Amino acid sequence: MPKKIRVLVIDDSALVRQILSKGLALDPSIEVVGTAGDPYIARDKIVKLQPDVLTLDVEMPRMDGVDFLRRLMPQYPLPVVMVSSLTQKGKQITLDSLDAGAVDFVSKPTSDIARGLKAMLSELCAKVKLASTANVSHWKAARTVVPARLKTLEKRALAESTDKVIAIGASTGGTEAIRKIIAQFPATMPGVVIVQHMPAGFTRLFAERLNQLCAMEVKEAATGDRIMPGRVLIGPGGFHMKVVRSGGFYQVRCEPGPPVKGHCPSVDVMMHSVAKHVGGNAIGVMLTGMGSDGAEGMRAMREAGARNLAQDEASCVVFGMPKVAYEMGGAHSLVSLDSMAPRIVDLLSERRI
């Protein structure tokens, strides 16, 4: 019989702890080994109960979830799924939590509580099971500093790259990976389009946060936005983002639609459009994430002449999307996260005969 996933539920509300515990216990592969009302109690129970995964409330008294994560992860890295409110403050703290090492998050329902609660618990069970397979070992000890922007490569990279498009897809663990890569790009980098699996409301905050950290302009995409050097467009949650050609330039179209491979926005949708309209002028990048979204689109990009990279297993939180993309022939090579930005710049500067 397979070993059950041992979960510790951390929330300051006794009612929420009870609801989450009962919901998780309905899954035969999950065992709730304990609950904690605040991070101080949680710290002791982590040592005593040795859980495989934590669920953690975003906003708590005494110490919020982010501060707890920042203290926990360097000493005792564990996969953590955040339970978030959809308030503006809750969204901000959720993104802080992902930066601090949380694997994923679920949002508490705000309307139609009965139906919303059932959906949230189902999502929580799925994400706890995914989190149990996540690689969080790189959080052990001191966190690495984001490398300096690649200023010395800037002039060389620009030689033949003014009409290039860089298309990046990511899911679980992707926010941190994207930040590390984009923060190294110079302001004159070719246009970048990104699909990160994330609900509506979170993508705008994610873009705003990246915009404060990066030399490039970063914004949540809207239909009609031009793809141009120095700009990064993040696909909005709840909309598929497609790249189209309009005269002499590229722009994006953001449209609602059914989930593709379970996601909206979908990496496949974006990459298929890049294959069709950008072809050999594109570079594709597949980062950490569960599942296979983007693998077919990346293969189409390669067949259209694009050069593609996928994140390697050792640096992924979840080696799913990059693995499938590489195995299906979409990615030319597997690259570590630390080497990804320099490798992209190298590809931009290569002459193609």
Curated annotation (Swiss-Prot):
It is an enzyme of class 3 (hydrolase). This is Protein-glutamate methylesterase/protein-glutamine glutaminase. PANTHER family: PROTEIN-GLUTAMATE METHYLESTERASE/PROTEIN-GLUTAMINE GLUTAMINASE (PTHR42872), PROTEIN-GLUTAMATE METHYLESTERASE_PROTEIN-GLUTAMINE GLUTAMINASE (PTHR42872:SF6). Residues 6-123 form the Response regulatory domain. Belongs to the CheB family. InterPro entries: CheB-like (IPR008248), CheB_C (IPR035909), CheY-like_superfamily (IPR011006), Sig_transdc_resp-reg_Me-estase (IPR000673), Sig_transdc_resp-reg_receiver (IPR001789). The gene is cheB. Keywords: Chemotaxis, Cytoplasm, Hydrolase, Phosphoprotein. The keyword Repressor does not apply. Residues 159-351 form the CheB-type methylesterase domain. It comes from Syntrophotalea carbinolica (strain DSM 2380 / NBRC 103641 / GraBd1) (Pelobacter carbinolicus).
